[in-house]
Each structure stands twice: as structure tokens, then as C-alpha cells.
């Protein structure tokens, strides 16, 4: 049997693409080979694809010398499959190319299954890798899981200001300015008052310039182009900048950290990145907490604009009423489409792991006939591939925050914000999506 798995192309939701890669990595890591029959090939962007083709020709020639006939044949088959996949591409795709081919052992340790797939990652992998062994190599894929939220940094002191961004492990200096502010005047008399006034005026103008450049660097199309903003410095400038009305009001809500650093310029940037690490990590969790808290608030207010539980959520989605789906990233519900072999009618079931082992869900209750399973998908995967067909968005929820944990345990890990009110009792009717013995206390788990 040949299995073809393809990661999604670049979508409008990076978190969905990251979720797909995370699931793919888990699948690959669970694959075990019989000997050295599993090939992993990753080609970075702009790499000459013919170079990899020549490498495979050499590896294929070397495989002919393997003494064990069974091992030799397995390795040759895996490398040949990789070559065939490579032939599908005239040049390396924009984000690089990943190919995994080989024969794996099933859970019984005896049955073999052929794995054979290729895909372009949703963002570049800048690392070449070729490996032929008893398992698939996934380390380069993990770089795709680094959260690519972009954060802005302003390092400001009495000598100048630096504007930069940090995205994953990549930082970029956007702009630097220098300034020469007059020192404090130590002499008394009228001249000291005049110098103090001039000094304060230059300081004010300097802060105005810093604030203006903050807007030009971190606002695009009338909205912030970074997820969060860090202000850093070794004097009072950073605090004044956060408190002044000269800073664009659109930037104020995204200030996530204000830190003291010992240096200005790039050394100050390095220090600010280190000191603000916890704050940057918390941004994602804060966003999740806010989203789920809003969900709970809507429930407590009984607005009728919330749906939860697998059956209600999926029916509302089918009606086009769901605007945003909240989905636990490790949801263990499988979507089945079953067909009556005599009548020809179909039904859709959403079953948890316990229900999947119960044969009653796969029988026609009137006749006792076994139903034909014509589709079987993890519900989370199905949603990730089909949510756009219903005009919805997907937001993944973890169980790492208190709110996320409550959403998973108390509401089944799936729910949504509605576009309009839906009478779920009328909408559901007698649909048996969970079987006639649907139990909300177990079917939501």
C-alpha cells in the first residue's frame, strides 16, 4: 500500500500550517523501519535540485553492494521512490522541498507499509539533509514550529535610538539615529536657566523624533505590523516614550515590556531580547486567555452567539453560522461518513476513542446490517482542510492556561463564535451524529 501525505500549502492561518507540521512530525517519528529502508531528503530554497539527483544516483549505486538481499532491496526501493519524487520537480520550490520515502512496520511488527510523499513547507527550511536509516529524520522540520510572531524593539538613550524586529531567531535592524544632547549646565545665574530650557527643548524634540520614527517603522496600512513592542534603554527616555502623547496611540496597546539595559545600540538590543524573553512568550498565552475568556463571558451572558460540543458545533458550521471555531489542538474525535449498503443513504458520525470501539455505531439500527465506512478522518484534520468552505476561521486552544484547560475539560475542546443565533434543537432535529445513544457527558470528551 502506498501512502501519500502532503502538508498544506501556505494558507491564511500560519497556526494551522504549524499544527499540520506538528502532526506530520508526530506521525513520522512514530514510523519504525525494518533495517535501513527509510529515506529523508530535505533540499533548501535555491539549492540546485540536480545536485540532489546526482547524490541519489551515487547512493543507489552504493546500495547495490549491501550484502543482505532483503536490506539491499529495501534500500534500493526507498532511494528509487525518492528519485521518482524528485523527478516531479524541475527546480527547487520557493520554500524548499521535503521528501520522505520508505517501508515501515505496522503496530503488529510484521505487516509492512510503504510511505511515499513530498511537499513544499509553508516557509523556508534553510538546511540540507539526506539520511537513509531505520527511522525518518524530522529535526529540520521542527524549525517550522518556531512561532514567527514579529516583535518590535526600540532601544533609546541619550546618544540615540535603534529600531529593530525579532522574528523567531532572526533579528533585523530597521533604523538607527544618533543625537547630541547638551549636558547639564553646572553654573548658576540666568545662563543656567537658559541652558536648562534649551536642553529640555532639545530633549523634547528628540523624543518627538523617536516617537515619529516608531510610527513609521512599526505601523503599516494604518495598523501595527508587529505583535508586540519592547521599549528599552539605560535612562528615563524609554519610560517617557511610553507615557508621552507623542507616541502613536495604535502602538500603546502592544507594548509588552519596558526593560532597563546597560548599553545602547545593538548591544542594548541583544540585552533587551534576553530580558524580555518571558514577556514575548506570554503574548501567545495572553491572546489565548483573552479569546477563551470572551467565549466564557458570552456563555454567562446567554447571548445565544456561542456554540460548544462536537454535535452542535458541527451542525452550526454546516449551516454557515460559525464565524470562528475554537479547537483543542489535541482533540481526539474522529469523523466517520458511513453508508447503508442497501438503502444507499449516508450518515456522519463524530466518535471519541471509546465509541470507535463499539460496533453499534457502525450498524443500521433497524436492520442490524453493517454500515460501510466511506470516509474516516481525525476531526481536527478535517476541519483544517475544510474550514474555509464554510467561511469560518480556526483558532487552536491549548490546555496550558487555566482558561484553556477549562475549555477542554468542561466544553469538550470544540466550540465557536456564531454569526447569528441558531436554534440548535430545531437545527439538529433527530440527526444521529453521535448515534441514537448520544451522551453529551461522554461524546464531548
Curated annotation (Swiss-Prot):
Cysteine disulfide partners in this protein: none
InterPro entries, alphabetized: eFR1_2_sf (IPR042226), eRF1_1_Pelota (IPR005140), eRF1_1_sf (IPR024049), eRF1_2 (IPR005141), eRF1_3 (IPR005142), Peptide_chain-rel_eRF1/aRF1 (IPR004403), Ribosomal_eL30-like_sf (IPR029064)
Record's subcellular location: Cytoplasm
Cytoplasm found in the keyword field: yes
Molecular function as annotated in GO: translation release factor activity
Listed GO CC annotations: cytoplasm
Sequence intervals crossing the membrane: none
Any Pfam family: eRF1_1
Keyword vocabulary terms for this entry: Cytoplasm, Protein biosynthesis
The keyword Nucleus belongs to this UniProt entry's keyword annotation: no
Function according to Swiss-Prot or TrEMBL: Directs the termination of nascent peptide synthesis (translation) in response to the termination codon UGA. In Stylonchia UAA and UAG codes for glutamine.
Assembly and oligomerization: Heterodimer of two subunits, one of which binds GTP.
Recorded family membership: Belongs to the eukaryotic release factor 1 family.
Protein's name in the database: Eukaryotic peptide chain release factor subunit 1
Organism: Stylonychia lemnae (Ciliate)
Lineage of source species: Eukaryota, Sar, Alveolata, Ciliophora, Intramacronucleata
UniProt gene name: ERF1
